[in-house]
Amino acid sequence: MIRHFLRDDDLSPTEQAEVLQLAAELKREPFSRRPLDGPRGVAVIFDKNSTRTRFSFEMGIAQLGGHAVVVDGRSTQLGREETLPDTAKVLSRFVDAIVWRTFGQDRLQAMASTATVPVVNALSDEFHPCQVLADLQTITERRGSLKGLRLSYFGDGANNMAHSLMLGGVTAGMHVTIAAPDGFHPDPSVVGAAEQRAETTGASVRLTADAHVAAAGADVLVTDTWTSMGQEDDGLDRVKPFRPFQVNEQLLAAADSEVVVLHCLPAHRGDEITDQVMDGPASAVWDEAENRLHAQKALLVWLLERGR
């Protein structure tokens, strides 16, 4: 049966654990799985600029024995002279999977509605599930079991990382806190979905406007840019409300002594995170970036093996 990965709760807790275990295996033995030998192809479409997503998917697909057909979405007929469902039918005849970094989540859903190969969300305005798989792999490397850990996110609670951390974190059995200024809290429908999943895993979701409450005793501190792609024009207006949510040495001191600090990058040093924290011993940012490669390879292997 064809499976898609459009948002973090598309994987059950057991399935998420399987992907993370496979990611660890592929990090140890990068060329041990070759499901794309042939070479077989994967469409990798970018409607938004990318560094880590492009490099990690291109290299990962090559290590799996395949060929990445990388396309700028603006140079195709996607959603313009051809409908997304029609495009999905066509691409499904050419490639073994479709990886898409785009805008609205509805575009991914339209693509997946008729695709006969797996569709993977490489980032949308609402979710960033591949990044959170890499985050969970990184936390596992530093702290062991994920279940019961306290993860706190600081910044724009309405952005894709906050949404995905809630869904992915509670799927892993973590207690997730979103610390954001008033007016920047997560989509209530995503909070509801996370709470529903949390009921099955013993996890919890908490929203707060107090960064120090969120940091107290936390095992993981996560932040992201205060201004997401497409919001650059109002970047200066965001500095004042977000300044109390900067991940700095004061917040770090309130957290657990073995706290792990994550940032999906690119980082605006001195805004959402200080140099001292980002370059300090608690930071796992560079391992986190590398793990995009391993987590995404594992996801592709998992999806492809279930679709055959």
Curated annotation (Swiss-Prot):
Keywords for this protein: Amino-acid biosynthesis, Arginine biosynthesis, Cytoplasm, Transferase
Residues binding L-ornithine: N160, D224, S228, M229
Any GO CC annotation of this UniProt entry: cytoplasm
Gene3D superfamilies: Aspartate/ornithine carbamoyltransferase (3.40.50.1370)
Pathway: Amino-acid biosynthesis; L-arginine biosynthesis; L-arginine from L-ornithine and carbamoyl phosphate: step 1/3
Subcellular location: Cytoplasm
UniProt xrefs under Pfam families: OTCace, OTCace_N
Gene Ontology MF term list: amino acid binding; ornithine carbamoyltransferase activity
Catalysed reaction, written as an equation: carbamoyl phosphate + L-ornithine = L-citrulline + phosphate + H(+)
Chief site of localization: cytoplasm
Binding site for carbamoyl phosphate: S50, T51, R52, T53, Q77, R101, H128, P129, C130, Q131, C264, L265, R292
InterPro entries from the UniProt entry: Asp/Orn_carbamoyltranf_P-bd, Asp/Orn_carbamoylTrfase, Asp/Orn_carbamoylTrfase_sf, Asp_carbamoyltransf_Asp/Orn-bd, Orn/put_carbamltrans, OTCase_ArgI
EC number: 2.1.3.3
GO terms (BP aspect): arginine biosynthetic process via ornithine; citrulline biosynthetic process; L-arginine biosynthetic process
Annotated family: Belongs to the aspartate/ornithine carbamoyltransferase superfamily. OTCase family.
Functional note: Reversibly catalyzes the transfer of the carbamoyl group from carbamoyl phosphate (CP) to the N(epsilon) atom of ornithine (ORN) to produce L-citrulline.
Protein name: Ornithine carbamoyltransferase
Natural source organism: Mycobacterium ulcerans (strain Agy99)
